[in-house]
A protein has these predicted regions:
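Beta-strand-enriched, solvent-exposed domains that form extended recognition/catalytic surfaces
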Residues: 23-215, 570-648
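Pan-zinc metallopeptidase signature
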Residues: 23-83, 419-569
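Zn2+-dependent metallopeptidase catalytic core
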Residues: 135, 150-164, 168-299
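Beta-rich interaction/scaffold domains
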Residues: 649-738, 789
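Lectin-like carbohydrate-binding module/patch detector with strong preference for beta-trefoil
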Residues: 730-868
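Residue-level detector of functionally pivotal "anchor" positions at catalytic/ligand-binding pockets or at interdomain
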Residues: 865-891
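C-terminal tail/sorting-segment detector
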Residues: 902-913
Length: 913
């Protein structure tokens, strides 16, 4: 059978070439000059008199010196002997199109379809005759290309011009479709020509075979069924296996059998919803304003393998997905199926907003926005909790690992400005602004890695958002890690990017954002999955969950996008209670208006935590700092949340008292009699607070307010705790010359150790605490609680990075300076000298690293060799404010003007002469 088919193919090809021997590109001009004399028009579609009244034999005799192929065309026209639907594709008008290779730069998009429109004519080893009736202007490009099946690119291009153009179709076992490229010269300037300034061009095409195509502007589903039924797939010379479905903005360039299997009866719904998807993306990116001069198409093609992707000229979808992404009924039954096409087309359109690391994230703006726009379900992606967790770890935005999570940053802007209708021109204007002032990925080195300044990438995006919105969005971008510093940080994103951002650059950018008067400190909380919201797809009821993972009820308790609309609603009825390092939000009767809660260091203004739930966590480094809790409100301002102690509700006051008692209990539970347990309080210093605790505890247990109200007990306890913590002689502090071991506060069997690779944490089974590399000494810098740290072998800690810490220097001049900070639970944590970063925390590899905020960052410190027993003598300098501010007598009272005698200076007993 195969041999017979091959033989038939060879014979037919030979016959075809022989038949075409009279007409080719070399003699086309001569033949055309003779042929068009018989017609009323230049494209030879209307025979003139008397030729139209002649018999076939008479006409052939008149045309005896013209190529037979042309004579056969004339006879067909005279007799109106067109096959069904043939004339529609043989004689057709074509609209001008813009060149995707030019407009990809104008619009900062990936290349749209490189094949604007099919002619519906196929061929295989045949000559095709193309009549062009008009002159082609210099600024216009007119050509044809041949495409095998549903290949994404054409090949063998031929320019065509006025007159007769003879084009040979290449071939093998499969025919080619002839595509037309009628490219006109338009641009984005105000003076540009419009598409309407260029005429439609009419072509008359003969030769080859009529395969046809579907056009939503011309055809209906009845025609679609007819097109599928009459397709001549069994003919060798017309064995074209593809089919095209033309929408207004999309072209399905598919395998005929695959699309017929999933859309056997109707195609208008499929191409219709894809058109709406592309129009929606265009509107969001502000591209629809150019529709009068830009009409490139998105191509969708199918194939075997490689699930879905976007590349130059087309988007691709695996055969098995077609049944789910083409018929609207199938898509609407599970709107998550919108995600794939919107995601891939989003790849084509994302360039303008594509921050480093976001190639698989920024395009999901279109996916989530389209799903929200359809109005049946909620959207996809992790919630505020993931952003919050990343913020607590100080992870820079490009390094945040959850791609769908990063997508929510873009979508939160959509929810606020578009869904909540704060400014529905926000994204179109943002895209337009960034098309003119583009994100800059930097230069590419010899290893193809890009060296990117975050100021020209993510921070340019953020600042442009503020500019377009005329709002201060700095806190939103802070929550997303935009201001975290990066020192040539390697980021993978379909290539290598080496990203840098200094603290000075970050703060300068933040300052520029904060110029805008209107604040948006609530934007980080906005969600569409906090509580049910009405459907907008014409069906009664509320939106259903996108899936169980992102279900309503799992994504937090505050921040539903609808609650942002009415800015007159103010927060009220909220209180907070603190227990150790956990802050819990409490609601009085009638509490309302909060969109989320934020925790600040009241002294520095630093944002410490935020949540769209009821819990906030005090970071280790701020455990002893003054705190401020606020509720974000719909107008972007914050409402200061009072403590439950300030509530008029007695039950809340009692709850606050119990929380305060728990704090006192924790504070006084770690004690020392010898001073070896660093950070612990001396038992002798706890007499007064223990007595007060006992009395207040009895009052709370018995609900007795006869002596003091609950508020008064709280105030007394807090006052006593503050007095205890400020008494320098009440707690055991680090001393020079003494030798210590450090045990991790979370990984309690792990001690800090130096090996040849740097600092690690290991167990006593791995290395005994008696070894010098596991014993540490602290040399004072002269500033209270600031130290150089070295092991007993004399090696200083002299370098610290995110992935490890070095302990290799023998010279104090190269050593790092660390500040020791004492926590209420008796542990100590270290920060860098400037206090900005937590240092010496144990990561998941048991490496002691720096500049991360993780839970294994506290240390229990114990003196194992006491060498500092002498009383020091110092010469007091009145002008030394650093010393003067740290002088106490032996009872713990601060001394402003000391005389000769023994005092506590910077935590040490000294004798002032």
């Amino acid at each position: 059978m195969k041999l017979r088919k091959l033989l038939l193919s060879v014979l037919m090809v030979a016959a075809s070439l022989a038949a075409n021997a009279q007409l080719n590109s070399s003699n086309a001009t001569t033949n055309y000059a003779k042929f068009k004399k018989f017609f009323n028009d230049d494209i030879c579609t209307e025979l003139a008199l008397p030729y139209s009244a002649m018999t076939d034999e008479q006409l052939r005799e008149q045309m005896s010196d013209i190529a037979k192929e042309l004579v056969d065309v004339a006879i067909k026209i005279k007799n109106d002997a067109w096959e069904k639907n043939e004339k529609e594709f043989r004689i057709a008008k074509f609209k001008p199109h813009t060149n995707p290779m030019i407009w990809e730069d104008y619009m900062n998009v990936y290349t749209y379809s490189l094949m604007p429109v099919p002619t519906g004519i196929t061929g295989n080893y045949e000559y095709v005759m193309i009549f062009v009736g008009d002159d082609v202007p210099e600024e216009v490009s007119l050509s044809v290309c041949k495409v095998v099946g549903n290949d994404g690119h054409g090949f063998s291009y031929n320019s065509i011009k006025k007159g007769l153009n003879v084009v040979q179709m290449p071939g093998d076992e499969e025919a080619r479709m002839l595509f037309l490229e009628y490219y006109v010269n338009t641009d984005t300037t105000a003076t540009s020509k419009k598409l309407a300034d260029y005429p439609e061009i009419t072509l008359h095409i003969e030769g080859g075979h009529v395969n046809g195509y579907f056009d939503i502007t011309k055809h209906d589903d009845a025609y679609w069924r007819e097109l599928l039924a009459t397709h001549k797939a069994d003919s060798v010379l017309s064995s074209y296996k593809g089919i095209q479905v033309m929408g207004e903005k999309v072209m399905f360039h598919m395998s005929r059998d695959k699309i017929a299997a999933v859309c056997p009866n109707t195609i208008t719904d499929a191409i219709g919803w894809w058109d709406e998807l592309v129009k929606f993306e265009h509107k969001l990116m502000g591209a629809d304003k150019y529709y009068d001069r830009w009409n490139d198409l998105i191509m969708a093609r199918n194939g075997e393998g490689s699930y879905m992707y976007a590349t130059q000229g087309y988007t691709y979808y695996e055969n098995s997905t077609l049944a789910e992404i083409l018929p609207w009924e199938a898509v609407y039954s599970s709107p998550g199926r919108i995600w794939g096409p919107a995601h891939e087309i989003g790849h084509v359109n994302q360039g303008t907003i594509n921050i480093v690391s976001c190639t698989e994230a920024s395009n999901n703006l279109f996916s989530n926005a389209m799903i929200h726009n359809v109005g049946k379900t909620t959207t996809r992606g992790v919630g505020v909790a993931t952003c919050r967790d990343d913020y607590s770890k100080k992870i820079a935005f490009p390094l945040r690992g959850d791609v769908i999570g990063k997508s929510r940053m873009f979508f939160q802007l959509y929810l606020y400005f578009h869904a909540a209708e704060k400014d529905t021109t926000f994204y179109p204007r943002l895209f337009e602004a960034l098309r003119h002032d583009r994100l800059n990925k930097g230069y590419q080195d010899s290893n193809w890695a890009y060296h990117t300044s975050a100021t020209e990438d993510q921070l340019k995006f953020a600042e442009k958002c503020c500019e377009i919105a005329q709002m201060d969005l700095s806190e939103f971008f802070e929550a997303w890690g935009f201001f975290e510093t990066m020192d040539e940080t390697v980021v993978g994103d379909y290539g290598t990017y080496i990203v840098s951002l200094s603290k000075e650059e970050a703060e300068a950018s933040r300052a520029r954002m904060q110029r805008y008067e209107k604040k948006a400190g609530h934007l980080m909380f906005i969600e569409d999955r906090i509580k049910p919201s009405p459907r907008t797809d014409g069906v009664a009821g509320n939106r259903i969950d996108f899936n169980d993972e992102y279900a309503i009820g799992k994504m937090g308790s505050f921040g539903q996008w609808g609650d942002y609309i009415d800015e007159s609603v103010k927060a009220q009825g909220y209180y907070y209670a603190r227990s150790l390092n956990t802050i819990t939000i409490k609601e009085a009767t009638g509490a309302k208006g909060a969109l989320g809660f934020k925790l600040y260091n009241a002294q520095t203004g630093e944002l410490l935590d935020f949540n769209n739930g009821y819990k906030l966590t005090v970071p280790v480094a701020h455990a002893n700092a003054p705190l401020k809790v606020v509720a974000a409100q719909a107008d972007g301002t914050d409402y200061t949340v009072p403590s439950v102690a300030d509530s008029d509700d007695e039950e809340m006051q009692l709850e606050s008292l119990n929380a305060t008692l728990a704090t006192v209990k924790n504070l006084t539970s770690k004690t020392t009699t010898t001073g070896k347990e660093i950070g612990h309080f001396y038992k002798s210093a706890l007499t007064e607070i223990n007595a007060l605790y006992k009395e207040a505890k009895a009052a709370a247990d018995n609900k007795d307010t006869s002596k003091h109200s609950y508020k008064e007990w709280i105030a007394l306890l807090e006052q006593e705790m503050e007095a205890l913590k400020s008494n320098p002689s009440a707690r055991a502090y680090l001393k020079e010359l003494d030798v210590y071991t450090l045990t991790n506060g979370q990984l309690r069997s792990y001690g800090m150790c130096y090996d040849k690779y740097g600092l690690i944490a290991n167990t006593t089974q791995q290395m005994a605490n008696t070894l010098p590399n596991k014993r540490w000494m602290f040399e004072s810098t002269g500033v209270a609680h600031h130290y150089y740290i070295k092991n007993k072998n004399g090696l200083y800690i002299n370098d610290m990075a995110d992935n490890g810490t070095s302990c290799s220097g023998e010279d104090q001049l190269t050593a790092w300076v660390f500040k020791a900070n004492y926590l209420d639970d008796g542990t100590v944590y270290f920060t860098t000298q400037d206090g900005l970063y937590l240092a010496m925390d144990v990561n998941s590899y048991n490496i002691v690293a720096g500049k991360e905020l993780v839970s294994a960052a506290t240390w229990g410190i114990r003196a194992v060799e006491l060498n500092n027993t002498a009383i020091e003598e110092v010469e007091f300098e009145a002008e030394n404010e650093e010393v003067k501010s740290e002088i106490y007598d032996l009872t713990g009272r601060k001394v402003e003007n000391p005389t000769k005698g023994m005092y506590i200076v910077n935590g040490k007993k000294v004798f002032i002469k």
